[in-house]
Amino acid sequence: MYFKILIAASLAANFLPVNAENEYLANAESMHPASAVNGNSVSRESVFADSSKVFDIDEIVVVSQPKETRRLRQQALSSSSLSSFQIHKLGVHDLRELSQYIPNFVMPNYGSRLSSSVYVRGIGSRVNSPSVGIYMDDIPVMSKSAFNLHNYQLSRVDVLRGPQGTLYGQNTEGGLVRMYSRNPFNYQGTDVKLGYGSRSYRNFEVAHYNKVNEKTAFSLAGFYDGQNGFFRNSFTGERADKMNEAGGKLLVKTRLNAGWDVDVLANYQYVDQNGFPYGRLDLATGNTDRPASTFAGIYRRNNLISGLRLTRQGNLFDFTSVSSYQYVKDHMLMDQDYLPADYMRILQQQLQNSLTQEFTFKGKQAVGGFWHWTLGAFFSQQWLKTNGPVFFDEAMTAPIGNAIQSQMYNAMVQAMADRMIAQGMPAAAAQAAAQRAIEQAGGVGMEVSMGAPGLYHTPQSNLGFYHESLFDLSSSLSLTLGLRYDYMLTSIHYESSAYMSMKANVMGREATYTLRSMLDGRTHDHFEELLPKLGLTWRLDSHGSNVYAVVSKGYRAGGYNIQMFSDILQTELNANRQNAMRGDYDVPHSADDYEKVNKTISYEPEVSWNYELGTHLNLFENALHLDLSAFYMQVKNQQLSVMAGNYGFGRMMVNAGKSHSCGIEAALRGQLFNGHLDWMVNYGYTRAVFDEYRSGEGAEAEDFKDKFVPYVPQHTLSATADYRIDTDCRLLHSLTIGANVNAQGKTYWDQANSYSQNLYAVLGAHLDADLGKVLISFWARNLTNTHYNTFAVDNAATGNKEYFAQRGNPFQCGVDLRFHF
């Protein structure tokens, strides 16, 4: 039975070719636990004779790798992999949940599906350029806004830590995630999943896999996922994080003559949710209140990832072409102050179209018996239009209007009183008389309205050429040399403005004056980078154990902060407020002003060097796998997400001088009791600190040297254990009892390290009953109802700094039913 195939997720060395189509084993892994290809059950004994061994996913789930010439644990890198079976056991549905079981890899669960921050080894950001690349069936996901997807019907997920720029280019400085769909040539039938749980969690999936003939196969899948949410807005009374999402995907694989294969992929998803359930954080007690914003945040997204993959296996080399078109259209509305009082809100609407093309050539056989090579070229073009107005509401505009009204009233009273005093009236009497005269005439009133609309076009072009060679210097020693040339052209056309409309009522007479500041400009920049890689691997034994050392360069592209415009323009309005008291006034801008604006909104590329030592050990006749690595990274021009300006209208990217990070990663996986107990333990430690970083100027400058880089957990820990009990019952084939725990912290929330989240742990469990064609899974998460924050932020919308946080999800339980026929 399939439950006896318990696979360790770390990848051991073996000697099958990377492109081998080991269909029988791939079928066995991908299958529903009680199912088999064409209805025939597959037992572990029919696949591997020794049930005490831990086997690699590379041995079970074989996927085509157009670039690498070695399996993951034969390479000089730190990695983790999970099969569909392990993903099911952990109950994960997206990369946020998956990251809880990967050392030094964190994608916090907060905000909405728009939130896609990933932090690896001290590298990461909340906005703009991502630190990690994501590939879906060899297609690079181009929009960071599309990273946070619902993942389903996958056969395998690989997570590579450390810079992967040589083969995968910019924005893979922290690492790379590769996701693979099930292959309909290897796996057939129909899968149905039904799930329901507390908080009205609901999930439905259906997928059909059909091998039409020896040359054509296809799969068609769809899903719906939703829940009422965990948090209720204490001000509005509605759910602050309810969500509904749905989607479908199609994969058609065709094997043509002359060694050509054609794959067509389309993956569409739609999400509609309430988001950003941030409550006030009390730094003294560490308690986080329920959300209490003026209205519930909203996020909606349409996302399409489509691609065409052509491959040809030749006698001398393999050729791969991957083309893709990607589309993202979303809508986000957020209460930017997170308070019941209506200070300000931000609307963001993105429309992005992307095209990518990549050609890869990989040597079929070692040249001279020792030289393995890969070379290729990559091109992408992105068009992004962002509509991002900021609205300032009554809680902010009323005090401004009152202040102006008070100034006008006092000036009028004083002017009238001075004339009366000049005519001989006592000062006190003159003041009182002037006040009565103004009030009798209708008084003085002032209404202020403010806004900051903005439309931004930010196209990007990227071109890369790469080569990597692997030399077998001896039967034990291998040398890897790689180099990539990367070129980036980025530009921005901004049409941004801010206005302050002042409607004055002065002694019965009304007048409206408008103060405007408008910016309409263009600028562009380009960046070039060489991304080298040098690695050595020493094979220790015939079981695939090895040690390695690698030096590689990472790179994140520079760009422009559209979040800065609201603060720039608001500062100009405040400076020119008096000019609008005499009539409409438009703030003028010179060429020098535009040059300063262009400099203010730009940020530089981030560059890092990674030095790493590690080992992949297969111990006790492959009964235990140990992966261990130690790394040191030097980062220059570190990109850091901070609040924009004095008021905190949004996030912007700044370059934080220099930083460094160091740490270790360890993964243990094994089996006991003749394969009935499957377990794993992962641990990661990261110490990421600033070496040079000063914020502000003059007396207000702050020095953050030796402060910890924010949002990076210092420790990540996870462990799982699953015990299978076989039965002789015809109805119940087996029971699997499992438990898991994940922990992380300490995490600082700002560059000053003034507030943080301590180390916390979350416990989960599941019970799976294998009934043959049906699998019933009972599950629970956060069994101890641990209180912790997944995210925290501060702003000064009220004029004083306020702190807010999102709490982690509390206890939840449910049941899933899986059918295969």
Model-predicted regions and their roles:
Residues D137-P163:
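Short acidic/polar hinge/loop motifs at secondary-structure boundaries
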Residues R309-G314, D318-M334, N546-V550, Q563, ...:
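Membrane-embedded beta-barrel scaffold of Gram-negative outer-membrane proteins
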Residues I60, Y555, G675, N742-D750, ...:
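C-terminal beta-signal and adjacent terminal beta-strands/loops
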Residues G189-D191, Y196-Q227, F231, F235-Q273, ...:
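Transmembrane beta-barrel wall of Gram-negative outer-membrane proteins
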Residues K362, T374-G376, S380, S475-L479, ...:
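Gram-negative outer-membrane beta-barrel transporters
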Residues R232-E238, F276-A292, D335-M344, F391-P453, ...:
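Solvent-exposed loop segments that connect transmembrane elements
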Residues L95-L98, S117-G122, Y135, N171-K193, ...:
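N-terminal periplasmic accessory domains that precede
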Residues Y24, E45, V54-H88, S115-S117, ...:
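N-terminal periplasmic "start-of-domain" segments of outer-membrane beta-barrel proteins
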